[in-house]
């Protein structure tokens, strides 16, 4: 029910923007009328992942203007890593929630991103170690910044590890009392069903 949409398509910045706008228009039209009981609005939240492809704030704002034009803006729950981590842009004036992911390697990095205006943190308890993840979650909590879990296409056992972290996070803004966990292993592992069978309680 939480629609992850990859943006930042190949090409020049102008070509990328045009492709991203067209992709958003197509997806938004295809999902027209879809509803979920898990969001406050009842509509499907959109989660954009840019992987640092946007070079300038102005380009991202043009995408958001397009989202407003087609009626998709209110459904954008977050945009993850729109800019390269070395491109230290103040984002306080961007009117949607931006999330730090790859750029938040440590708790100190997370604090820096929060000070730059980022309003969410992606936790990766496997990639960034559980101990560092707890430190990042702590500083984010202290500053009132919500977190969610992303799993890097891990196996079923490690999905459970992430669930344990996600279950202890506060509700993500816009959701009805729910934490947020991204998992996509079932879409990428050929033998996912077999891998699940190794779990002592695969249907839990």
Predicted ranges, named:
Residues 1:
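Glycine-rich active-site/cofactor-binding loop and its immediate structural neighborhood
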Residues 5-153, 158-159:
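Catalytic core of soluble alpha/beta enzymes
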Residues 153-204:
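Flexible C-terminal active-site loop/helix
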């Amino acid at each position: 029910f939480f629609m992850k949409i990859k943006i930042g398509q190949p090409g020049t910045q102008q070509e990328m923007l045009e492709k991203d706008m067209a992709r958003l228009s197509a997806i938004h039209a295809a999902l027209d009328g879809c509803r979920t009981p898990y969001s406050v609005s009842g509509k499907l939240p959109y989660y954009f992942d840019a992987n640092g492809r946007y070079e300038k704030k102005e380009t991202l704002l043009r995408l958001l203007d397009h989202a407003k034009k087609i009626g998709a803006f209110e459904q954008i729950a977050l945009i993850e890593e729109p800019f390269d981590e070395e491109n230290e842009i103040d984002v306080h004036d961007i009117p949607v929630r931006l999330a730090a992911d790859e750029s938040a390697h440590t708790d100190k990095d997370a604090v820096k991103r929060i000070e730059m205006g980022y309003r969410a943190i992606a936790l990766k308890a496997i990639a960034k170690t559980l101990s560092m993840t707890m430190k990042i979650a702590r500083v984010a909590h202290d500053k009132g910044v919500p977190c969610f879990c992303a799993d890097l296409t891990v196996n079923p056992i490690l999905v459970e590890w992430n669930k344990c972290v996600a279950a202890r996070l506060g509700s993500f803004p816009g959701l009805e009392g729910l934490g947020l966990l991204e998992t996509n292993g079932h879409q990428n592992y050929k033998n996912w069903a077999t891998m699940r069978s190794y779990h002592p309680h695969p249907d839990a």
